[in-house]
């Protein structure tokens, strides 16, 4: 895998007219046994920044426990704190036909289903030089999407806060019940380095345009 335990990546999030709307950190916390599965433990945390924070106080954390072999999701945890409202949820994803493990009520999903965070790391694991397209079911805790990823450019220069990099450009489109989700699309650039570091994400969503860029060299 291109990522390693202990990896921490920090990003600056720009939204609408706000160049520093939020800070995002992505972390490969550990490899661990979860109910008999060998898993990667991924974590993403997002915190709104001033002046946006005066309008939208957001402190969210997402944890993904992803199979080390198949990269399908076994457990997805959401710890949301948004504008005074808190919500914690633990989702135990079980492929149809398999038995549940543990005491958490299972969510039955198609084999190979990822959660959003685990899916992002799965995109890093792809060899985009030899796999131009990748389709995967993604469950976000509420809705199930068919995510279709495609290589748009094998190599191009990308400038972010962390520096200038050669990168592969990937487009992401979301489908639900066979129809493309309107006004929602993503572009992602992965560096041409052994870690395939995510450098930049451009998102078009109903809430507006979002730019997420690597803020500093990985550590």
Language-model-detected regions and their locations in the chain:
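Acidic, serine/threonine-rich low-complexity disordered tracts
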Residues: 1-94, 128-219
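Hydrophobic, well-structured mid-protein blocks that either form specific transmembrane helices
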Residues: 83-126
């Amino acid at each position: 895998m291109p990522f390693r335990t202990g990896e921490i990546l920090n990003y600056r999030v720009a939204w609408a007219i706000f160049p520093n709307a939020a800070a995002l950190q992505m972390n490969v916390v550990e490899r661990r046994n979860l109910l008999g599965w060998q898993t990667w433990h991924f974590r993403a945390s997002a915190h709104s920044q001033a002046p946006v924070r005066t309008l939208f106080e957001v402190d969210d954390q997402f944890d993904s426990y992803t199979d080390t072999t198949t990269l399908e999701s076994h457990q997805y945890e959401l710890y949301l704190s948004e504008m005074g409202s808190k919500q914690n949820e633990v989702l135990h994803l079980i492929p149809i036909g398999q038995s549940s493990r543990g005491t958490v009520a299972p969510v039955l999903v198609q084999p190979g289903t990822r959660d959003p965070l685990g899916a992002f790391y799965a995109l890093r694991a792809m060899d985009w030089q030899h796999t131009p397209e990748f389709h995967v079911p993604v469950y976000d805790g509420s809705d199930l999407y068919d995510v279709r990823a495609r290589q748009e450019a094998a190599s191009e220069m990308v400038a972010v806060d962390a520096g200038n990099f050669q990168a592969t450009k990937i487009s992401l489109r979301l489908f639900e019940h066979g129809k493309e989700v309107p006004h929602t699309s993503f572009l992602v650039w992965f560096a041409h380095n052994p870690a395939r570091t995510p450098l930049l994400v451009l998102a078009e969503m109903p809430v507006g345009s979002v730019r997420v860029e690597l803020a500093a060299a990985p550590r």
